[in-house]
Amino acid sequence: MIEVVVGIGAGLIGIGAGYLVAKKINDANYSIFLEQAKAKAKAIEFEAESILKDAKVKVNEAEFEAKKRYEEKGSRLQKEYNQKLDDISKKEHAILNEQEILKNSKDELEKSQNQAKTLYEEGLNLKIAYQDKLSETLKVLEHVAGLTEDEAKNMVLRKVEEKSRAEIAHIVRKYEEEAKKEAKKRANYILAQATSRYAGEFAAERLINVVNIKNDELKGRIIGKEGRNIKTLEMVLGVDVIIDDTPHAIILSSFNLYRRAIATRVIELLVEDGRIQPARIEEIHKKVCDEFEASILEEGENILIDLGISKVHPEIVKLIGKLKFRASYGQNALAHSLEVAHLSGIIAAETGGDEKLAKRAGILHDIGKALTHEYEGSHVDLGAEICKRYKEHPVVINAIYAHHGHEEALSVECAAVCAADALSAARPGARREVLESFLKRVEEIESIAISKEGIKGAYAINAGREIRVIANAKLVNDDEAVLLAKEIAEEIQDKIQYPGEIKVNVIRELRAIEFAK
């Protein structure tokens, strides 16, 4: 019994001791957990403060940027406002000048009317005095010479007539000179009005385009293995592809603006695509040609909309767009035609003509230049023929002939076009004679080659020192290609004057294509 009691007591003591130990451990763990929780809370608090500080910094930066943008925009708007105020002030000044000119013209007109009235009254008085003098003279003659009244009257009339003719001739010359001076003054005023109210842009056409590339490694890919790619490019595009030490640039040279523009776009697409090979070059070339045909029509439509001209045949609209890729004496044909259209409208309006009809004749006066690369004949004859075919207004056709002196100007609108054409062409720096003679020589060289039978195309390259002729392999064999080169060279030598020598390069390529099915 005692042992049982002792055992129970020992057990209770063990339990109590265990409880105390466990409690102590729990207290220790609680302290640790509490410290950890406090540390985490401090870390979270620190992180929150850091985020708050970052947010405040960003807010301040955003406020600063917004304030800066606002100030810049305000400054820009203020400048624009000041500029518009200056423009308005200039226009007001111009209007005041116009009003002053009109007032002076009105005063001069009133003065002229008063002078005419005075002269008329003086003429009446002179007539009365003349009648009185005539009667008196007749009486004297009858008394002195014993003449009859009719004989005396005829003698006096002859003398008066002779004297009157001399006086009339003097008066006519005087008023003719005054009329010429007034007409010249009026013409100068109209031309000054036209040129001041139209400020056109001008940029001389170049003979090269530059294609920018990302790195010079692409130059090797464009040249291709054994030069295959560059040969295909030059043959298909009809331009001179120049790859030299110029960093990140490929130069395209050709006198033909249309070919050069297409070539530029083709090479840009090839570089962007990365697949540069002969078949891909031809595919991209066809795609770009189709795009350009569509863009030419759109260009023509936009120009006519800007000018306020309607009811123009689509073929003529397309030719207007094509003028963008033609040049005359270094002056872009479309820019020249637009300038002539605007000036013609202003001159016609000032002289009492139809402004819209003058603009129509102005934009179409050089339309034949869009066809000179494809058909034989002068741009005047080609332009008149195409306008007659599509039933354009007779004034337009007259302007096409008259601006080169082939016909007389038969209307105010036509005369306005002739004057505007002379203004645009004669402006200093507008045209370059040497460049035009070079372009004409190159075109003649190409036309000689194309005129031969079995030739698909001909492209002058290397500044006109070489012509590359593409022969149809089905119509021309190798021996005939040699003869063609000789014939073309001889004809160029006989018909064209040029410095140095011209290389004639006839290319005949046969492609056999079959599909495995």
Swiss-Prot record:
- Output this protein's name: Ribonuclease Y
Record key words, sorted: Cell membrane, Endonuclease, Hydrolase, Membrane, Nuclease, RNA-binding, Transmembrane, Transmembrane helix
Domain named HD is located at 333-426
TM ranges = 1-21
Species this chain originates from: Campylobacter fetus subsp. fetus (strain 82-40)
Reply yes or no: does the keyword Cell inner membrane apply. Answer: no
- Does Cell membrane appear among the keywords? yes
What's the main place this protein lives? Answer: membrane
Give the UniProt family note: Belongs to the RNase Y family.
| Single GO molecular function | RNA binding
The UniProt function text for this chain reads: Endoribonuclease that initiates mRNA decay.
Task: Please state the Enzyme Commission number of this protein.
Answer: 3.1.-.-
PANTHER family in the record, alphabetically?
A: RIBONUCLEASE Y
Question: NCBIfam families annotated for this entry?
Answer: HDIG, RNase_Y
Gene Ontology cellular component list: plasma membrane
How would you classify this enzyme at the top EC level? hydrolase
